[in-house]
Amino acid sequence: MKKILIITPHYPPSNLAAVHRSRLFAQHLPAFGWEPVLLTVHEDFYEEQLDWNLHKLLPAGQRIEKVRAYPVTKPRLIGDIGLRAFLQLRKRALEIVQNEQIDFVYIPIPSFYVSLIGPYLYRKTGVKYGIDYIDPWVHVFPGSEKILSRHWFSTRLAKWLEPKAIKHASLITGVAEGYYK
């Protein structure tokens, strides 16, 4: 059986939208000859309310690796768990890829910044990776036209980082066709 590493900062007991896509992929991949290894952030670092009933839906014996994240600060400077756990996710992903026979890395986004782990792993190990767009990364936020605003910076940063994330991707999928055109 081939092995796939799924890097998803949120996973049950989180109940965010991206969680369900990763959860269902991981549930059905074994039927197609793929053994999923989930890499996520420990739920102690989630900001959302946890749903332990959702956790009960996970297949018995599913391998889930958890990392820590930097806590949310007051004032809230960085909320995105993909940023708060980026270094920890990247380090653990590299360990898994180097020490196990990982055939593919699947990265559902958001969290958008986690997609940058794909090219890093590719450069370090040659492992192929794919990015699954649940939401578009580059889009205009309300207020993006206001120069030097938070949304202006976010839009510019997304336009600069996204090409770096997808440059060596072997696969790009999306919920809507426009995401990957």
What are these regions (language model features)?
Residues I96-I102:
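Glycine-rich phosphate-binding loop signature in dinucleotide/nucleotide-binding domains
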Residues L39, G130, G143, A165, ...:
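Catalytic cores of nucleotide-enabled group-transfer and carboxylate-activating enzymes in metabolic
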Residues Y113-L116, Y120-K124, W137, W152-I172:
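Membrane-proximal helix-turn-helix segments that form the acceptor-binding/catalytic region
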Residues P12-S14, L94, Y113, V127-S149, ...:
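A short, histidine- and acid-enriched strand-loop-helix "catalytic/donor-clamping" loop
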Residues A60-K91, K146-R150:
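A short, charged, and often flexible helix/loop element on the N-terminal side
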Residues M1-A69, E177:
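N-terminal subdomain of nucleotide-sugar transferases
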Residues I81-L89, I102-T125, I131-V140:
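An aromatic- and histidine-rich active-site surface loop
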